[in-house]
Amino acid sequence: MAAVSVYERPVGGFSFDNCRRNAVLEADFAKKGYKLPTARKTGTTIAGVVYKDGIVLGADTRATEGMVVADKNCSKIHFISPNIYCCGAGTAADTDMTTQLISSNLELHSLSTGRLPRVVTANRMLKQMLFRYQGYIGAALVLGGVDVTGPHLYSIYPHGSTDKLPYVTMGSGSLAAMAVFEDKFRPDMEEEEAKKLVSEAIAAGIFNDLGSGSNIDLCVISKSKLDFLRPYSVPNKKGTRFGRYRCEKGTNAVLTEKVTTLEIEVLEETVQTMDTS
């Protein structure tokens, strides 16, 4: 054998090996004048949960351009098929085009097989496409739906890795949303319970992350119905103005005034038509 793998008994506690490795790499790069790439913030909170009869997906509605709010009411819950929807975080153009492409391919697959597509099929299509581009398509997705095998919920990362869990969160506000899920989630919840839980999780992301904000959208998918609730709630209502804040003309005194005359040179031009006959 060229190499021998020695089994080590696992020890309790968090392992800081990767932290030490990153510190060594950062110091080595600094000597050569390079900087390690920083994590890219997606500026969104999206989440999903499995309840007794189906799936509840949720998202905020703020779209950002750096530190500027570009859109206060954008829709981040995308149609994949009549029984499957997908929340998108990351680059808005990438999430829109990726979900449209997969929705189109899934419709062709459905017409070919003559049945409603399965959620695992959509998951496989998405992960294969994203893995092919090695993370350069900035689409972090939460895929949920109900098919003949029951409700399914997946989180899909931009590099193509996926998780199948009873509750998932993605985006820059995902840590706050996950804290709510880990505290209040329980199996086999009723629909209203699940909607309230997802709403609280998205609200936690909105109030604890600058990249998330505005309203909360929900999508409820079950075998018997599909409810798209936009908006489900508005946690950030604009305050009412109680007075006028515009000063009347003449309120501030003019301290200095200077009038400068402009020298204008007037040129006269004549235009003659050319005879083309």
Curated annotation (Swiss-Prot):
One of its GO terms (molecular function) is threonine-type endopeptidase activity. InterPro entries: Ntn_hydrolases_N, Pept_T1A_subB, Proteasome_bsu_C, Proteasome_bsu_CS, Proteasome_sua/b, Proteasome_suB-type. Pfam families: Pr_beta_C, Proteasome. The active site is at 44 (nucleophile). Its EC number is 3.4.25.1. It catalyses: Cleavage of peptide bonds with very broad specificity. It is found in: Cytoplasm; Nucleus. Keywords: Cytoplasm, Hydrolase, Nucleus, Protease, Proteasome, Threonine protease, Zymogen. GO terms for biological process: proteolysis involved in protein catabolic process. Component of the 20S core proteasome complex involved in the proteolytic degradation of most intracellular proteins. This complex plays numerous essential roles within the cell by associating with different regulatory particles. Associated with two 19S regulatory particles, forms the 26S proteasome and thus participates in the ATP-dependent degradation of ubiquitinated proteins. PANTHER family: METALLOPROTEASE TLDD (PTHR32194), PROTEASOME SUBUNIT BETA TYPE-7 (PTHR32194:SF4). Belongs to the peptidase T1B family. The 26S proteasome consists of a 20S proteasome core and two 19S regulatory subunits. The 20S proteasome core is a barrel-shaped complex made of 28 subunits that are arranged in four stacked rings. The two outer rings are each formed by seven alpha subunits, and the two inner rings are formed by seven beta subunits. The proteolytic activity is exerted by three beta-subunits PSMB5, PSMB6 and PSMB7. This is Proteasome subunit beta type-7. The lineage of its organism: Eukaryota, Metazoa, Chordata, Craniata, Vertebrata.
